[in-house]
Structures are given as structure tokens and as C-alpha cells.
């Protein structure tokens, strides 16, 4: 039976914004003006950027007006994120100075088109006669103003051409209007030594950068060596290295020629770099390199990058394309990992057993073998492999986890099958994520007060849903699917569904009891996507089969509807996460008579690169300011939903000398989690359930937004001001002001939380009535 959603008043849908707009994540790009004459210089610049900063890969905007298709192809071969933009010469037709046929003048004009870009928050311009020799991290972390290196010869009030670090306030119509007005007035000087119009508008008002970020060739006259700390070497002057160079600058030009490489040599040089290699560059340059050379180690690196991004089949394909020697354990392990992630278990087992022969890869290989056996339901084999991993490395955390899972005796089912509901969820391990630990029980409370095995038959989402599992589910009254953001591609990958429930289509089709999807979330991070058609096919079948399909926020609803045909859109409805209405669901709940005078702080570190981008240092410094400000008013304590969350306390102490108590919530049972959050006065949390759980027990919240789902929830309760982006330029001040405002008006804010909660409870009650009809209760 399928129930059509009734006319229940729900919170307004979340705005249809991009993920980075919701999280406030800074969009960073490089930019340059390129023409055919300077193309050799630009190609060397691209190579130097990748080789000197192998972990950096932002969009590179190429401004041009005459590049040939073959030239564009050569550029694209070197960088995976090229954005081509034609300059608009009409902007400059009315300018009163400048020889339009002079390249240096045209370049000075056309680079002004950078200020007309609106897609980015920070743009770093580079000249085509530059090479990058050092780390650009400082430039990528800049957050304010327009930064440049002052001119070396012609006065510190002017900026030198080539390098600019431009922030959002300058990428505006208002600033462009100033540039155009100055250009039309003719009140500027334009020659090969300066930026002319820009210098006239700024009049010295720019952030000064160290000369090493735009180290001009002229400082090396007399064949001086390039200083070791030079980050960007700029070949100013008429004579460029690719045109034959200039006498007296031999050592500088030798540095440029380090990047005069063929595509094949460039790819090999990048793959040979140590340290962190950026996923996009590694895949872009490594794929043709592996195809040409068949190099096993390069194939392993590219495959590992694919796995990190959730592109498991791509990882299988590239490692399967090369011959892996029997004694090279690491590639066998990575291939085994990729194969198990697409549910090709027998092939994966063979690869992992080969990897287990090497002592340095054995523990990880055994842990993966234990995981596969557990997924297939073979606890004895899983325990055997996990024990082997521990014997190789007694400290190996993953092996210990699988030993614990495989050795745990499942609770005895007390009720009869016909009285039970089957429940697919992610059942968290001891010391696992506190929010995920609480979720399955809270979902069950949405169907009644008895959450025990008398009423419920547990189905772990990550174990293969085989014929035996299908038979057990069909013996129950119905199937509930819910307990977190199950729509995420990489937490426990499988090739059967490409989301967290490991269910083949044929077994999903075989379910003949009502299927109720309850408060599931679409959990892809900003910068993460579902690339597999397999997920869409499984999702469509699930929606078709479901009698009830409820998602926990309107943002998830929009994302899922976009993947479905129109006729299925109306089946997707709003069902708030039950943790947000815990006060209504927990039998005998009583609000605390007195609260502790504390503020609890939570930060999350899973997928830290997607959460923070280049801004972690900024985030930590701003949190330190907020902790000092709030701490002068109320005691601040850290709360860890998982072990990784404890990093915030370590980093604050090491970097800023702040010591905070750490509460290990991952060790708490469900009642203790709710009780702690109910007793505190305010929770500042980055995890989704560090917002939803305290809200559900009536505690005010401020969300540190690093994931779209935080903004989705705040939009649903019509309180976007209860969130602040981890990227906010003034995070510390904003957080302090809002926190103290909530603490000073605490009773009123708690009343507001209760009122917001009532809106979600009405939706939950209306859905519960529909669910009772579905279940014939």
C-alpha cells in the first residue's frame, strides 16, 4: 500500500543553492591572460605550478582572445580544471590611453577582465612569464583585501604587475565601474612597468606581499643565483626564456628550463613527487602516464586517488590494465580494496591474500578480508582474518574493529516474526559515532515505545542482503529503512546499490512487505558526488517499491527528486530526523530543572579537506577567539562524537595555548547522550547530530556549517541565523556575539527551540498516522 502525502503544513523548503553557497566554502581560482606568443611561457607556468605545489589544483581561468584549438588542447593536457574565457575588448574601446597593438598594453587591459569574474571568492593572477618555484599556501590562505608585491624600482606605493591575490569585495560591479571610469578618464600611466589603471584606482591601498612571491628577473642581473626562498620567479623585460633569453641571467633561465618538458616527462615528474598529490591532477596526469608506460606504482597511486573519491570501478580498471608482479603487495592490496568496493569479492580475496604475504601490508589486507567475510555473513571467517591482522600488528585499529564485530553475539530475538518490523540501519560499534549510535533506537521510537528485539528484527545496512535475509524480512510485518545519512557513496561502498544498504536489485524486488524509508538523509559533502548510474537505478527501484519514502530535510528531497523521473517526485516527502523531536518520543521525558553553566563545542574531522579547504588554520584561530570570548561568560567544554573529534582540543592547545575539557561522548549510551545535551545551555556543533540531538532535547544550538545538511536543517526550522560557516571571515566574532546573545536570552531561546520543534512534531505525527494505515494498525 502506498500513501500519498497529505496536505500537512511543513517547514519551507531549503533554498535551491549550490553546496558551496550553503557551506560558505571559498571558491579559489588562478587566472592569466594568454595569447599565442606567450603560450610557451604559460605551459611552463602550468607545469611549474603542479610540480612545486603538487597538492594544489584549483580552477585556472584562461583569459584569451585568439588561442587556436590546438593551443587549447595543449593547455588542457596539463591541467584538469581549465576554464576558458574570452576577453571582452568592448570594455576598453573608450579608454583614452594605450597602444591596442602593443602586447604589454593589451595584457594590462585584458587582465582587468579578472575583476569581472563572479564565480570565485579568491582569484590569484599569474603572468605567463612566471614560473612557480615554492609553496603558495600563504597566498591560498589569504582572506582579505587585494594583495600584491610592491614595485622594486619604482616606489612602494605601486604594485608590481603579474601577481595579484584578489578577494570577493574587489570582484564586484562597483570596483569594475571604478576601473572603467579611470580608463575612460585617461588619468593613469600605462607602460611596461606597472598596472596603470589598477594602480591609479588603488593609489597604494593594497596588502603588501613579500618580494619572493613576485621576484623579478632584473634583481638577478649579473647572473646571480635565484634565492632559495623564491616562490614565484618573474621574467620581466623584453627577452623571454623561450625566445632565447637574455645575457646576464643564465642561472635564472636555468630555473625556467626545469619546466620546459614534454607532456610525457611532465607526467612522469608529477607522479614521482612525494607527499600529497591532488586527486584531480593525479588522475589527469597519471592516467595517460600509466597507459603509456604500464608502470605499476603509478597505477597504484591513481587507483588510490579514485578510491578516495569514491570512483571504485575506475580504480579497478586502471590497476587491471597493468601487470602487477606477485611480490608487489601494495598494488595488490589497493586492487583488492577496489574490487571489494564493487562487490567482486572472490577476485578481491585473491588480491588481498597476495598482499597479506608482505609484513608491511598484511594487517590492512587481513582487515579487508575480515570485512568482506563479515559483509557476506561469515562471522567465523571474519574473526579468523581479523585475528590474523592483530597478530601481525597488535595496534591495528581496523583489525580490532572487525574482530569485535565478528565476535559479538547478536541479541536474541524475543518476539514472534509476525509481530516484528525489520529495520535496516547502520548499527554503530562501541566507541563509534555517538549520533549514529543513537539513531536506530530513535527511529524505532517513531513507531512505538518498544525499541527492543521483541518488536524489531535488526538488519545491518552494510551486510549483504542475500536470499536468507530476504526470507527473514518477508516473514515480518514490514521493513523500515532509516538511521542516518544512508545516501552516501563511500562510508561502506558496495557494487550492489552504491549506497550504504548493500542490497542487490533482485532482492529488493523480492521484498513483499511494506517498505518504509524513514528520515534518511542525502549526505554527500560539498565537492563529493554520486558518479555511478548504479546508485540512481537502485534509488529509483527503492522509491517505486516504497509505501512510504521520507527524507529528513528539504535539501535531501531536492537532491533525490533531481535523480528521479517526474512521476516519482510526489512519493518523496518530508520526515524530520526523529532525534529533532526526542522530547516528544522518549517516554516520560522531563526537561531538566537546572542546566549546567556550560557551552559544549564539537568539531568534525572526517573528510577534513572537503570540510575546510584551505581554511583550517583560519577556522582554528577564529575558534580560539570565540572560546576566549565565550569562556569569559560561560565554561566551554569539547564534546567528541567520535575519536577523531578530539583533535579540536589538541590543536587548540598546541596552536593557541587553550586547554579545554574533552567529553568522550562516543563512550556514552543513548540515555547519557540525551541527558548531557539536555543539561547544557548551548551546543556549538559541526556534526549534523551535534545540532539535531541537542535541538531535539530542547537545547539551543549554533551549527558550524561545513556540510550542506546543516544548512538544510536550519532552513527547515526557519532559523538560518543559528548557523555560521566554518569559512566565515569573522567566524570568531560572529560566533561569540551569537553565543552570548543566546546565553543572555536563554529562556526565550529555549522557548523558541520548543516552538520550532512543534512544527517538526506535527509533520511526524501526520506521517505516523499514514504509517499506521500502511501497517494495518
Range-by-range predicted roles:
Residues 78-118:
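Active-site-proximal specificity loops/subdomain of glycosyltransferases
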Residues 132-159:
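Conserved donor-nucleotide/metal-binding helix-loop-beta segment in metal-dependent transferases, i.e.
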Residues 293-294, 326-327, 360, 394:
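Short coil turns that delineate tetratricopeptide repeat
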Amino acid at each position: 500500500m502506498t500513501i500519498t502525502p497529505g496536505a500537512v503544513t511543513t517547514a519551507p523548503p531549503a533554498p535551491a543553492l549550490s553546496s558551496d553557497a550553503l557551506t560558505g566554502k571559498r571558491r579559489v581560482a588562478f587566472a592569466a591572460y594568454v595569447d599565442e606568443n606567450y603560450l610557451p611561457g604559460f605551459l611552463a607556468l602550468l607545469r611549474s605550478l603542479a610540480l612545486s605545489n603538487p597538492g594544489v589544483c584549483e580552477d585556472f581561468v584562461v583569459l584569451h582572445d585568439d588561442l587556436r584549438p590546438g593551443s587549447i588542447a595543449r593547455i588542457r593536457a596539463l591541467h584538469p580544471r581549465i576554464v576558458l574565457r574570452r576577453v571582452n575588448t568592448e570594455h576598453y574601446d573608450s579608454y583614452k590611453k594605450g597602444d591596442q597593438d602593443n602586447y604589454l598594453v593589451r595584457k594590462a587591459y585584458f587582465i582587468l577582465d579578472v575583476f569581472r569574474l563572479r564565480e570565485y571568492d579568491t582569484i590569484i593572477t599569474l603572468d605567463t612569464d612566471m614560473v612557480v618555484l615554492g609553496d603558495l599556501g600563504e597566498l591560498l590562505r589569504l582572506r582579505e583585501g587585494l594583495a600584491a608585491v610592491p614595485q622594486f624600482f619604482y616606489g612602494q606605493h605601486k604594485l608590481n604587475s603579474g601577481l595579484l591575490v584578489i578577494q570577493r569585495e574587489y570582484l564586484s560591479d562597483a570596483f569594475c565601474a571604478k576601473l572603467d571610469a579611470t580608463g575612460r578618464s585617461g588619468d593613469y600611466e600605462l607602460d611596461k612597468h606597472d598596472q596603470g589603471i589598477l594602480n591609479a584606482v588603488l593609489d597604494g591601498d593594497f596588502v603588501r606581499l613579500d618580494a619572493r612571491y613576485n621576484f623579478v628577473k632584473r634583481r638577478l642581473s649579473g647572473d646571480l643565483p635565484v634565492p632559495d626562498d623564491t616562490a614565484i620567479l618573474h621574467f620581466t623585460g623584453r627577452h623571454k626564456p623561450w625566445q632565447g633569453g637574455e645575457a646576464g641571467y643564465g642561472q635564472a633561465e636555468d630555473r625556467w628550463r626545469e619546466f620546459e618538458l614534454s607532456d610525457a616527462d611532465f607526467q612522469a615528474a608529477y607522479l614521482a613527487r612525494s607527499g600529497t598529490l591532488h586527486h584531480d591532477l593525479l588522475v589527469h596526469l597519471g592516467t595517460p602516464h600509466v597507459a603509456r608506460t604500464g608502470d605499476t606504482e603509478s597505477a597504484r597511486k591513481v587507483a588510490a586517488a579514485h578510491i578516495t573519491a569514491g570512483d571504485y570501478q575506475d580504480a579497478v580498471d586502471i590497476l587491471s590494465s597493468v601487470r602487477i608482479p606477485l611480490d608487489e603487495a601494495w598494488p595488490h592490496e589497493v586492487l583488492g580494496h577496489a574490487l571489494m568496493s564493487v562487490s567482486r569479492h572472490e577476485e578481491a580475496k585473491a588480491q588481498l591474500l597476495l598482499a597479506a604475504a608482505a609484513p608491511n601490508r598484511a594487517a590492512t589486507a587481513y582487515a579487508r578480508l575480515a570485512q568482506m567475510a563479515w559483509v557476506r555473513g561469515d562471522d567465523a571467517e571474519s574473526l579468523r582474518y581479523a585475528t590474523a591482522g592483530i597478530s601481525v600488528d597488535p595496534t591495528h585499529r581496523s583489525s580490532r574493529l572487525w574482530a569485535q564485530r565478528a565476535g559479538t553475539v547478536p541479541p536474541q530475538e524475543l518476539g514472534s516474526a509476525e509481530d516484528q518490523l525489520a529495520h535496516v540501519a547502520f548499527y554503530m560499534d562501541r566507541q563509534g559515532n555517538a549520533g549514529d549510535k543513537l539513531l536506530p533506537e530513535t527511529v524505532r521510537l517513531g513507531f512505538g515505545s518498544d525499541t527492543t528485539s521483541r518488536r524489531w528484527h535488526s538488519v545491518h545496512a552494510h551486510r549483504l542482503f542475500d536470499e536468507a535475509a530476504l526470507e527473514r524480512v518477508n516473514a515480518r510485518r514490514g521493513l523500515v529503512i532509516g538511521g542516518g545519512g544512508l545516501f552516501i557513496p563511500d562510508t561502506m561502498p558496495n557494487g550492489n546499490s552504491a549506497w550504504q544498504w548493500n542490497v542487490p536489485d533482485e532482492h529488493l524486488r523480492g521484498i513483499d512487505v511494506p517498505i518504509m524509508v524513514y528520515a534518511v538523509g542525502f549526505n554527500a559533502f560539498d565537492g563529493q558526488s554520486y558518479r555511478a548510474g548504479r546508485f540512481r537505478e537502485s534509488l529509483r527501484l527503492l522509491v517505486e517499491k516504497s509505501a512510504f519514502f521520507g527524507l529528513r530535510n528539504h535539501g535531501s528531497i531536492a537532491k533525490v527528486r533531481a535523480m528521479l523521473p517526474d512521476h516519482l517526485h510526489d512519493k518523496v516527502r518530508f520526515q524530520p530526523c526523529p532525534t529533532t523531536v526526542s522530547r516528544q518520543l522518549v517516554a516520560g521525558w522531563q526537561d531538566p530543572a537546572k542546566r549546567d553553566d556550560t557551552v559544549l563545542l564539537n568539531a568534525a574531522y572526517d573528510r577534513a579537506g572537503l570540510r575546510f579547504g584551505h581554511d583550517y588554520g583560519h577556522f582554528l584561530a577564529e575558534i580560539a577567539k570565540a572560546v576566549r570570548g565565550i569562556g569569559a561568560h560561560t565554561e566551554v567544554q569539547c564534546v567528541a562524537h567520535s575519536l577523531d573529534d578530539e583533535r579540536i582540543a589538541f590543536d587548540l592547545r598546541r596552536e593557541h595555548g587553550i586547554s579545554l575539557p574533552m567529553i568522550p561522548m562516543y563512550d556514552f549510551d543513548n540515555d547519557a547522550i540525551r541527558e548531557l545535551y539536555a543539561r547544557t545551555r548551548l551546543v556549538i556543533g559541526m556534526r549534523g547530530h551535534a545540532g539535531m540531538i541537542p535541538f531535539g532535547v530542547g537545547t539551543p544550538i549554533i551549527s558550524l556549517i561545513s556540510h550542506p545538511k546543516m544548512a538544510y536543517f536550519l532552513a527547515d526550522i526557519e532559523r538560518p541565523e543559528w548557523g555560521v560557516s566554518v569559512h566565515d571571515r569573522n567566524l570568531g566574532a560572529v560566533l561569540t556575539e551569537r553565543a552570548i546573545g543566546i546565553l543572555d536570552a536563554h529562556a526565550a531561546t529555549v522557548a523558541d527551540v520548543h516552538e520550532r520543534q512543534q512544527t517538526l512534531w506535527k509533520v511526524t505525527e501526520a506521517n505516523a498516522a499514514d504509517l499506521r494505515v500502511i501497517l494495518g494498525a
